């Protein structure tokens, strides 16, 4: 009879093979053991390293400890207290669950495990040795908690040991692991030593407030990061994104400040990283740089598979596209909110109630109160830059035939260079238009188009200093503010009720005052195209916005709606027009097209915007 070729490997060899996946270097050992301490409920963890971890790794914690009866199994393969069924595997919240780390580590090192639970009078120590990895137990002296010592890593696998880097390099990797874990666990104290010298000491925070968490982030990522970062809190259903994202000006040529976590588990997930980098594409971040961020994604554990990578560095989302778009929209909204505030500062129009530490951009968060979030917008709201403007290309649909005819004549006319029209205007004594209150560009005046066709009784003549439209009506000249015209056009378009669904519904929590205001605004908001549902949760009204007017789709909706609920605005179109994207450059064709559109729908309001100018004094001198 032939000797069988297939046989079962001895435990030590099997464990060493498994260690090839789990134990890559000393930092891998530290990660596995510290995660075990966290699962044990420890709030203070001591990490002692000697010679980069090759000589000694000692992890001491004050967790729940391991009873004598469980010590032997703790070092066995596929033995764990974390899961016991397939259903548990699909709902994992613990950091460890496979039950192979201690067995794998003990197969390539001299490992001793000393532990004592609170209900046990004395501590016991366990270690495994020999070909069969038999576990021996003996009494020891130890406080409540656990200490694991890993000595002479890879002593029995010389090939693995020779691939270790210098002590300094290996300790750098250990330091990074501790930093990553400490970022996710601000309520845990960590102490890291190397060769008897304390290198890191992170004290546990007093509470779980954002301010306390921020202290831990600053201690690890630096004050420069936290001073140039936006706090984000974005939620939709079972998805919750929170943390800090750095402004584009602190992006880095390397990805050493890219920290992402899923349900408290540190990882480098491609879906998360891609969504965040895509969100920064619309910013002025230098090409090739990496954004700086510390973000935490909380998700229903049944919607994510953490058992897809040997070292658990990656996960697989059941609805990857939804998660990607959720993160993308959250980060984009945060960056957009900051860009608006920065631009407001540039034009010296500060938002009075803005505070840096409030979560001003987290449109999906569930705990936004008016006293913290409402932002009062002045009449001179910051103007977005031209690169962020929607397409205002001229169109003739819905415009009167006379306007279409005029537009055809306009585009066929050559542009004639003329004298600066500003020099020809002498306003009446009581005329002080806002358009001339700003600093005037003294550069060469732009070409002016002069036309003879009229829109209704309006005859557009020229663009003045890129701020006003010069008109003639009934032998009288008028100036029309282009900014006010753009806002009026925005108002008239809002009344059409054209709406667009949100990819991720916007969730808002209202206080009592906001709730009263909401009750009076339900119908007007619905008429403008908003689709908003409400429900009561813990005595508080919560709104879910699923559809908004098309013109507001790209705006900071959370900020706008909370400001509306805090205001006493009656005309909603006028209120929303404050947020209209106003171009910084105008062509005569655009201005005429807007005039033609608005003249049809808001003629009386348009009449109120014109300001008469008198050329008689100039003409008398000619």
Swiss-Prot record:
GO terms for biological process: mismatch repair. It comes from the Bacteria. The keyword DNA damage applies. Pfam families: DNA_mis_repair, HATPase_c_3, MutL_C. Keywords: DNA damage, DNA repair. GO terms for molecular function: ATP binding; ATP hydrolysis activity; ATP-dependent DNA damage sensor activity; mismatched DNA binding. GO terms for cellular component: mismatch repair complex. CDD domains: HATPase_MutL-MLH-PMS-like (cd16926), MutL_Trans_MutL (cd03482). Coiled coil: none annotated. The keyword Cytoplasm does not apply. HAMAP family: DNA_mis_repair. Belongs to the DNA mismatch repair MutL/HexB family. This protein is involved in the repair of mismatches in DNA. It is required for dam-dependent methyl-directed DNA mismatch repair. May act as a 'molecular matchmaker', a protein that promotes the formation of a stable complex between two or more DNA-binding proteins in an ATP-dependent manner without itself being part of a final effector complex. This is DNA mismatch repair protein MutL. It comes from Actinobacillus pleuropneumoniae serotype 3 (strain JL03).
